[in-house]
């Protein structure tokens, strides 16, 4: 049979009365006794093909033997469908192909799940074990088409802006950057290990010192950390670095690139500039450093009520350097029973809150277990602070500021989902700026970098590294989309003395800093330009653009929540010979 002339999903009225050759998989087969209809599928979609003895008795005879997922090639004429059989839901729904020739290329056993049913409830482990079948589903095929369009758009934009695509090593040195490294033993250097990169951070800075000015890479990164729905042990990063720039330059470039991507991929115009808020403002208003701004329900500080009311929980929190904050679920008073609110209390307990106080606003005041503590003036103040109205449910947490933020921030998202407050069609981009440079780790009894050790402090805060490092702010910025951290960036330290000081604040001895990062400190001696950049999570970006809720749906061959590959059964044991070559012994 001749070469394929087009894809199944591209057969439309533009090809009427033309002969086409198609190759693909049998999606559906319907035998009407003397007539056989088959939906033939490839990556672009499917088209109805018809076997009729008037066209070819031989082709009809062969079609009687085909089953789901057989691989076939057909030749035939494109014709308009009978008006009663038109399918407006698919691009090919106006036409059909009257088959004159068919050849079975390959047969298929009955698949473990039906590929022609999109909304079936198939166990995810089965889908991942037979991922090559799962990827045949049109839903996932479209996801990966959009992933390709996304990377193409990114490359086109960065190429237009003068960026060089430069690869960095995959086998590199283990350095303490936050998560655990994946280690690779060296056969040649006994007892020594490479690490798979958590990011190309240091190498891209070295490329700036090398004079390349603008670098990017769409690169695999590896982190041995606990998994969540939006995390994978290996993930793809859009890594970008620029010389002679400030924070505004990098953010402006990032906005323009994302605006281009959304326009190219979804044909949606994203307004610029993106909204901005400081880290402190995000935590105050949303209880999160990656706020979802598609709905209201902000956290409201009502600590002054705690000072005035004779309610011990509120008063104790305020008197012990804590605070009282509230969120208002508009019109939700009748939707939540006492039992429902008990479940919400258990939910905030997960985030460290000792309890969840609440009142319902009614026409003549308040109802609920703490309503008796509210005098008339307190009710008026509550309504003034929160704009709560009759029918609203008001929920309070009184605790240390970090506990209040985490618990109410999480509760805000939970309520929004339960009350269907989120407009899923929105793409709300946001910059979070003015991050703390450092965080204090109570377990380690030392400071750790809030982003990474190479982030520059704000110029005016450099002196604070000696006196009050906890108050130093970073030249750092995160871009957030719909409540997910899409990417993070910063202006980097480009001065060896300041970098050495940063290592000192982080608890490195001079010898440790030299052993771990001596090559970077040496590079700073030879004229390092000011530089900064950003790294975006490609998998996460595609997840949000396609409306998926699980990162695994945007990765062709993902790992499970326990970091295993059900398809290949990785990780797996290796032979004694392999271990011996690497001078390794497994201790059970």
From Swiss-Prot:
This entry carries the following GO cellular component terms, namely: cytoplasm
Outline what the protein does.
Answer: Catalyzes the attachment of L-aspartate to tRNA(Asp) in a two-step reaction: L-aspartate is first activated by ATP to form Asp-AMP and then transferred to the acceptor end of tRNA(Asp).
Q: Could you say which EC number(s) this protein's record lists? A: 6.1.1.12
**What gene does the UniProt entry assign to this protein?**
aspS
Q: List the disulfide bonds.
A: none
Region ranges (Aspartate): 201-204
What is catalysed by this protein?
Answer: tRNA(Asp) + L-aspartate + ATP = L-aspartyl-tRNA(Asp) + AMP + diphosphate
- What UniProt keywords apply to this chain's record, in alphabetical order? Aminoacyl-tRNA synthetase, ATP-binding, Cytoplasm, Ligase, Nucleotide-binding, Protein biosynthesis
Pfam families in the cross-refs: GAD, tRNA-synt_2, tRNA_anti-codon
Kindly report the protein's main subcellular placement as a broad class: cytoplasm
From the UniProt record, which GO molecular function terms apply? aspartate-tRNA ligase activity; ATP binding; catalytic activity, acting on a protein; nucleic acid binding; transferase activity
PROSITE patterns, sorted:
AA_TRNA_LIGASE_II
Q: What is this protein called?
A: Aspartate--tRNA ligase
Q: Which PANTHER family match?
A: ASPARTATE--TRNA LIGASE, MITOCHONDRIAL, ASPARTYL/LYSYL-TRNA SYNTHETASE
The UniProt similarity line reads: Belongs to the class-II aminoacyl-tRNA synthetase family. Type 1 subfamily.
For the ligand (ATP), the binding residues are 223-225, 232, 485, 537-540
Give the GO biological process terms: aspartyl-tRNA aminoacylation
Q: How does it assemble?
A: Homodimer.
Q: Which positions bind L-aspartate?
A: 177, 223, 451, 492
Tell me the compartments it is located in: Cytoplasm
| Enzyme class label | ligase
Q: What is the lineage of its organism?
A: Bacteria, Bacillati, Bacillota, Bacilli, Bacillales
Q: What organism is the protein native to?
A: Staphylococcus saprophyticus subsp. saprophyticus (strain ATCC 15305 / DSM 20229 / NCIMB 8711 / NCTC 7292 / S-41)
